[in-house]
């Protein structure tokens, strides 16, 4: 049997561990304040939106209010901060709070669903984004895409901390310079998530990852969250399309232009007209199409779409073998 002194030591150690664990959990009021400041600094929200956004975030964290000694209350609102941390660090604290309070299970899928929900609360409404994009486009198309691309990074739809893990290099082959990339930004699936996904009944809404209904969708075990996704409407050859950026950015400003309707990919004369019309609209961008053949792989053939961006592909640098008129 343990003597009284040993028991006291053990209790002290347990108390110390518990205290240390509590201290490691970020203060929710401070994290909310920092997140709202981040959104303001990155022009995701206006100053008049701050209190409204604080209350949206309190709802997400299932918190009824702020502590009486909260900086937000003491200063009668969210105060501007200097040197706001990168969004990945702020969201890391959000996830620690969510896990500690039992709001989510600590798996990669649940973490992604939750932090996307958080960012959705500070991402501008689609109408706001489209209006500003159009205003900039009327002045200069590049200004419009610059704004839209920076927005996607600021609202964490493009997860820059993950994109940085990708490996890219060039190889000087006998046929010319080859661009080689290894995409490491897609997180590995947690075994717990895989088991749950197998039991989850998908709703069929949205029909695929390229449907317009993804904009603002909360996601679930079989479909990623898209509360921070925003898309820009376009018209190509009389048909309605939308432009968004790829969250994985295989190359600079990797954009996706997808059909308003969930229809299969089909390469025909109209395809080339649409590609040319797009590059007329955005001269600083390239646009291309995957083959409509299943053997090629890698593309969502069930939904008509194109891919492009501000990138010079090796094919554009290749010499002509012959020319014809």
Q: Predicted segment positions?
A:
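Hydrophobic side chains in beta-strands
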Residues: 182, 245, 289, 308-310
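Conserved His + Asp/Glu catalytic blocks
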Residues: 21, 266, 284-287, 293-299, ...
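Helical scaffold of the NTase/Pol beta-like nucleotidyltransferase catalytic core
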Residues: 229-230, 262-287
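Active-site microenvironments that recognize anionic phosphate/pyrophosphate groups
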Residues: 2-265
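A short secondary-structure junction signal
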Residues: 255-256, 267-270, 318
């Amino acid at each position: 049997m343990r003597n009284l002194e040993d028991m006291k030591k053990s209790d002290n150690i347990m108390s110390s561990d518990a205290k240390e664990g509590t201290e490691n959990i970020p203060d929710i009021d401070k994290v909310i304040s920092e997140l709202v400041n981040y959104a303001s600094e990155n022009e995701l929200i206006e100053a008049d939106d701050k209190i409204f956004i604080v209350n949206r975030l309190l709802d997400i964290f299932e918190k009824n209010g702020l502590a009486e000694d909260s900086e937000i209350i003491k200063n009668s609102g969210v105060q501007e901060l200097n040197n706001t941390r990168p969004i990945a660090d702020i969201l890391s604290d959000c996830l620690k709070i969510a896990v500690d309070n039992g709001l989510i299970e600590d798996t990669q899928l649940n973490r992604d669903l939750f932090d996307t929900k958080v960012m959705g609360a500070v991402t501008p409404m689609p109408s706001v984004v489209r209006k500003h994009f159009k205003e900039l486009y009327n002045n200069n198309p590049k200004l419009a895409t610059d704004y839209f691309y920076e927005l996607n990074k600021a609202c964490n739809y493009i997860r820059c901390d993950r994109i940085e893990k990708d490996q890219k290099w060039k190889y000087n082959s006998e046929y010319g310079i080859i661009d080689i990339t290894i995409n490491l930004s897609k997180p590995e699936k947690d075994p717990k998530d895989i088991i749950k996904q197998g039991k989850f009944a998908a709703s069929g809404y949205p029909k695929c990852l390229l449907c317009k209904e993804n904009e603002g969708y909360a996601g679930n075990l079989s479909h990623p969250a898209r509360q921070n996704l925003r898309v820009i409407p376009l018209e190509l050859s009389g048909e309605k399309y939308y432009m968004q950026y790829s969250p994985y950015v295989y190359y600079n400003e990797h954009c996706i232009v997808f059909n308003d309707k969930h229809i299969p990919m089909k390469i025909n004369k109209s395809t080339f007209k649409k590609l040319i019309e797009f590059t007329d609209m955005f001269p600083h961008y390239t646009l291309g199409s995957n083959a409509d053949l299943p053997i090629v792989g890698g593309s969502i053939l069930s939904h008509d779409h194109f891919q492009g961006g501000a990138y010079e592909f090796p094919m554009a640098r290749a010499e002509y073998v012959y020319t014809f008129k």
